[in-house]
């Protein structure tokens, strides 16, 4: 099994270039870091939320949604694929919005950033699908755990990843998040 670590992705062009080497001939796992621009925009949302500026948060989320649309426009040619991806991304943006409106003073910025990691995974997944590279997103929350030393519990991770992989034996490319 081949493991690809994709980090510091700043543009759709860079994502295209970095994924060209991913082979369909062997099972692969892509460990994806949140795209740089997505992380920066969501960090700004967290800062505005810390200051309890909900109006600014909502404007930033709208700008963020538009930015996600730009990623899709630059990566996907199929309007149907774009619509499907936008719909899935919107679920995460709506969840962030609800969190910000319901409990603005107790929300953890890690929760906001986790949505950014999933959105980045969705964008990559839809791009690979359009390139006819069958893939599946493994949510790292379902298999990642840190030990007492604050490092990944390798035995736990291995056992749970193997279980998740059994659910998709015919999928050559698995996508997971580097930080959730």
Label every PLM stretch briefly:
Residues 1-180:
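Nucleotide/pyrophosphate-binding catalytic subdomain
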């Amino acid at each position: 099994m081949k493991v690809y670590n994709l980090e510091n992705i700043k543009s759709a062009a860079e994502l295209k270039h970095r994924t060209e080497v991913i082979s369909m001939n062997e099972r692969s796992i892509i460990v994806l870091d949140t795209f740089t621009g997505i992380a920066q925009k969501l960090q700004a949302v967290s800062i505005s939320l810390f200051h309890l500026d909900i109006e600014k948060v909502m404007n930033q989320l709208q700008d963020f949604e538009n930015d996600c649309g730009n990623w899709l426009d630059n990566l996907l040619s199929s309007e149907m694929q774009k619509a499907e991806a936008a719909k899935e991304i919107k679920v995460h943006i709506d969840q962030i919005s609800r969190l910000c409106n319901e409990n603005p003073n107790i929300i953890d910025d890690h929760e906001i950033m986790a949505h950014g990691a999933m959105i980045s995974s969705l964008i990559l997944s839809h791009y690979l699908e359009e390139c006819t590279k069958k893939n599946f997103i493994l949510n790292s929350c379902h298999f990642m755990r840190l030990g007492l030393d604050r490092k990944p519990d390798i035995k736990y991770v291995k056992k749970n990843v193997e279980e998740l992989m059994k659910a998709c034996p015919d999928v050559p490319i698995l996508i997971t998040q580097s930080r959730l």
